[in-house]
Amino acid sequence: MKNKVGAKKGTLKRLFKMLFEFYPVLLPMVLVCVVLNAMISSVPAVFQQNIIAVVEQSWQTKDWGSASGPILKYVSLLIVFYVLSLAAGYAFSYGMAIITQGSLKKLRVKMFNGMQDLPIKYFDTHNHGDIMSYYTNDIDTLRQLISQSIPQLIISCVSVLTVFCIMMYYSIWLLLVVLAGVVLMGVVTKKVGSSSAKYFLHQQMAVGKSEGFVEEIMNGQKVVKVFCHERETEADFDKINDELFHVSEQANRYANMLMPILMNMGNVLYVIVALAGGILLLAGTPNFSISGMALSISITVPFLNMTRQFCGNIGQVSNQINSVVMGLAGAERIFGLIDEQAEKDEGYVTLVNVKEENGELVECKERTDMWAWKHPHSADGSITYTRLQGDVRMTEVDFGYNPEKIVLHDITLYAEPGQKVAFVGATGAGKTTITNLINRFYDIADGKIRYDGININKIKKADLRRSLGIILQDTVLFSGTVMENIRYGNLDATDEECIGAARLAGAHDFITRLPEGYNTMITANGSNLSQGQRQLISIARAAVADPPVMIMDEATSSIDTRTEAIVQRGMDALMHGRTVFVIAHRLSTVRNSDVIMVLEQGRIIERGSHDDLIAQKGKYYQLYTGAFELE
């Protein structure tokens, strides 16, 4: 429990530090307005006492004429303080709106930018709906925390202190009675609050789980309907929803029961203070106070009102603490996302444009058709340039997604510039894993991977991936025009270059037949296009990047036979002069590969050309002749 309390304090401290960094001038000004507003709103009780004292004195002396002046003065001061309170409240509300929305904007940017630097492993191991929950549910709870809970908590705390000082000024005897009741209220608050706090974090996590499930089902709605699993899906959602209901009910039950309990305790305390005041007045007990004034009706009546105000503020503090705890649960999750370790990149070799002068490669700023690896040497400060060719070699590579479970064993292969290498094997054999190692989505456990003779660990990941083109089986398109989606492969590409890439991929003809041609909007991952059309656009996107190395996850496996013939002609031109790795899902597309690697349980068991492997009559032969099915 102490660790959890410490974590909450650390989160709150970090939140204030972040807000101060965002608004170093405005935040202190707003806090001053909050404090002034709270103090000013508590002062009218003093004027109330003065007015009652004047009336009491006039009643005793029967001199009402002399009472009008002091009463008018105190009423005027009361109006002035109310106006000041209104002005401070307006300034606080206006400034807090700027701080809240501005901070959330900057925080969302910080979250999103940080997310772009996370390794692929993070997205493979976290539910996408849960990640979305950071930007929706957690951000909303943080908004309530910054804009409402914390300011109200400060106002209530300052009001408590202000009223406490005023009560001490009037009567310490009555104040002791109030404090005895407040101690009991504090015990109840701690008991109930600690019970609800643990459920608020569970509630945030349950919301993320629920949103993750909904997002998953939305993406797979067609599969659900094809297999008629609507009722089973509803049952699964009911279980998740029941869990969310349970933790939310527990958290809010404790939180909502606190305020009524404190209000009733406050009412009881009000009666007790009234009785105590009456007894002290009747008994003629000497008053003990900072002011030194005798106990009278003019003191007792305002004191009773302050008692109600004091208990109300105590209740507000307790209520806001629960809101703060819930908000901190969201803040804790958000800071957890921000604190996720970014993808490590210790590379220092970069990819640059070069031109050839006097037989040597010279770096240049303008765009050329020639690229080279810029390799600085720390020993003597020299720089060497290695022309980008697309020579990829793996030597005795071992890898496991979990270090304790190796899934690739002793992988050794080489792909010379311009070669086409195909990976064949059942699901789980390691085909996709090998390509994930080439682009360094994951780092190897043992062995070496060299790109143009350079250890890929020395190459900056962004530059390494810029030299690779990837075409996935499951096409991903973004909201925007067809032209924008093609240009995503190279943001500096001109319209003519994008159209040329579309022609190369065989996509130009169908694009020109779209309602707006290249300006046709793509929505919902290209749901307004056929699977084949989406695949053609993704191929054009890779073509405009013009990389020396291509990785293809059997890009044509989702395209019909007629479209495949169109695509294959473009792909043959695209692959010419490039190193190509193909993850094969059907053997008819790999016959013309220079080398075919047959994988089984993370090992290369056969390698060679199509004719060589057929002649060996091994596993590839069995797959090709249908003795085994390729998955």
List PLM regions with ranges.
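Juxtamembrane helix-loop junctions of ABC transporter transmembrane domains
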Residues: 2-4, 8, 40-56, 60, ...
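An intracellular "coupling" helix at the cytosolic face of ABC transporter transmembrane type-1 domains
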Residues: 21-24, 120-121, 139-146, 150, ...
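Membrane-integrated ABC transporters
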Residues: 1-41, 55-77, 92-96, 100, ...
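Helix-loop-helix
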Residues: 58-59, 166-180, 254-332, 337-341, ...
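ABC-type nucleotide-binding domain
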Residues: 64, 354-631
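Alpha-helical transmembrane segments of multi-pass membrane proteins
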Residues: 33, 43, 81-100, 151-158, ...
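Transmembrane helices of ABC transporter permease
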Residues: 26-39, 148-202, 275-295
